[in-house]
Every structure is written in C-alpha cells, then in structure tokens.
C-alpha cells in the first residue's frame, strides 16, 4: 500500500514538472493568417503572414500560407518569389515545387513552370497532379508529343486517375484529332459512366466528324446527366441545329432515287 502511495506521489511530482511549450508569437500570427485565408480574406491574411515571417524568417507554414494568399489574389509574381524562398529553406518538399510550377503556369509562363514541376515529380513520383500540370505545360509550349506521352503513362500506371483521360482527350480535340479524342472519352466513361463532361466531349467530337446522328445521341446523354449546367443550353441548341442539317444531307440521295 505504501509502495503505491509513493508511486502516486512521484507521478504527481513528474506531472507538475511537465509543461507545454509556449506557442511563439510567429506561430500565433500564422494561425491567424490561416484562419483569415480559410475565410477567403486573403489581403488580411497577407499582413498576418508577413508579420509572422518578420519574427521567424524560417517559418515554412507562414511562407506557404503567404504564397497561397498571393496566388488567390492573382499576384503571381509575389507568390513565385515567396515559393522560391521556401524551396531555398526546404528543397525536399515536392509540394513547394509543385505550387511554384502552378504559379508560373497561371502567370502565363509554361516554360518556366516545367523544371519546377519536374523537380516535384523527382521528389515524389506519386504526385499525379504535378504530372498533369507538366503535361499541360508541355502542351502550352507546343510539345504535344511529350504531353501525350505523359498522359499515356499516367493512364497505363494509374488507370483510375480519370483526369488523365479527360485532359488527354481535350488536348486531342484541340489538335483536331476528334477520332482519337472520342476513343479516349469512351475509355473514360467505361471507368465512370457518370462522368458527364465525357459525354459532351464525345458529342462534340462526333459533331466535328459530321456524324450528326451520333452527336445528337450523346448530346442527349449529356443532358440526361446535366440538364441544368452551363453547357446544357449549347447542347440543346446544337441538337436543334443538327436536326435541321440531317434532312438536308439526305435530300440529294432522295432526288437520285
């Protein structure tokens, strides 16, 4: 009984000696900045992050929050400058290089984005979003073959990553290869039959290929899933126009008969 009593006393003494470290002023300002940023008060959050960094020049969370706020304010040059500072502090964090690449893309500088996105992937091969953004960057600098290679590799190694199918198909449409685009969209809806944008992509591809009956069918399938979307008006209007085109295309054959 005495043994247990002594143990309790010793435990109580030890607990009295344990105290949680006080949060620094820099940390508190960063937390406040995060709260303002989550509330979409980006300009207000910038001030908190800057004050936090003034106290602690190596506060990574404050730098990242600051860069994110600048990005949402469309102030990409400042976001880029802040992220570059972050990569100097920690050059092993794939997230920092990824965001740096994204900001360069958003600032209309895809060539500058490429090396940072590559570095993000080198650090973390599982960063699928970085690979998608890298493909987009290559497409924007007229390196569509490299984009296609990236999309095909993503689809091969991560068949459930649906964004790779959609982006590949959209790129093929931009290149005028509507046949291959439609095939890729079909692969996508095989994976997810509710991916409504794929039906619109198929319809538009068939439309461009002058397969109007098929186009109408897939415009309707799109409308079944998204009858109140922004693109629904276009789909309905196009169905109406194609219904008028189809009889006109058949008319010459009727005259021959």
Regions found by a protein language model. Name each.
Residues 1-28, 38-40, 47-65, 72-74, ...:
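Long, contiguous interaction/recruitment modules in multidomain scaffold/adaptor proteins
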Residues 2-18, 216-219, 223-257:
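Terminal, low-structured helical/coil segments at or just beyond the last alpha-helical repeat
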Residues 8-11, 39-50, 72-85, 106-119, ...:
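Structural signature of tandem alpha-helical TPR/SEL1-like repeats
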Residues 27, 61, 95, 129, ...:
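Start-of-helix register in tetratricopeptide repeats
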Residues 30, 34-37, 64, 71, ...:
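Position-specific recognition of the canonical hydrophobic site in helix A of tetratricopeptide repeat
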Residues 31, 65, 72, 99, ...:
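Canonical tetratricopeptide repeat
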């Amino acid at each position: 009984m005495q043994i247990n009593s002594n143990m309790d006393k010793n435990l109580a003494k030890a607990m009295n000696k344990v105290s949680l470290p006080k949060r620094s002023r820099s940390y508190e300002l960063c937390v406040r900045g995060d709260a303002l940023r989550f509330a979409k008060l980006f300009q207000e959050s910038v001030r908190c992050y800057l004050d936090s960094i003034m106290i602690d020049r190596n506060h990574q969370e404050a730098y990242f929050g600051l860069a994110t706020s600048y990005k949402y304010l469309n102030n990409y040059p400042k976001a880029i400058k802040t992220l570059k500072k972050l990569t100097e502090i920690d050059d092993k964090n794939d997230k920092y290089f990824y965001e740096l690449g994204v900001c360069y893309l958003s600032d209309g500088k895809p060539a500058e984005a490429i090396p940072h996105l590559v570095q993000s992937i080198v650090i973390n091969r599982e960063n699928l979003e970085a690979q998608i953004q890298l493909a987009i960057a290559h497409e924007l600098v007229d390196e569509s073959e490299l984009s296609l290679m990236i999309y095909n590799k993503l689809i091969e190694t991560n068949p459930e990553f649906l964004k790779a199918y959609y982006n590949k198909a959209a790129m093929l449409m931009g290149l005028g290869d509507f046949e291959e685009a439609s095939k890729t969209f079909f692969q996508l809806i095989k994976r997810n039959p509710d991916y409504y944008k794929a039906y619109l992509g198929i319809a538009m591809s068939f439309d461009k290929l002058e397969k109007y009956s098929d186009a109408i069918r897939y415009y309707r399938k799109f409308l079944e899933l998204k009858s109140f979307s922004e693109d629904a008006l276009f789909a309905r209007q196009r169905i109406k126009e194609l219904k008028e085109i189809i009889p006109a295309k058949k008319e010459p054959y009727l005259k021959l008969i």
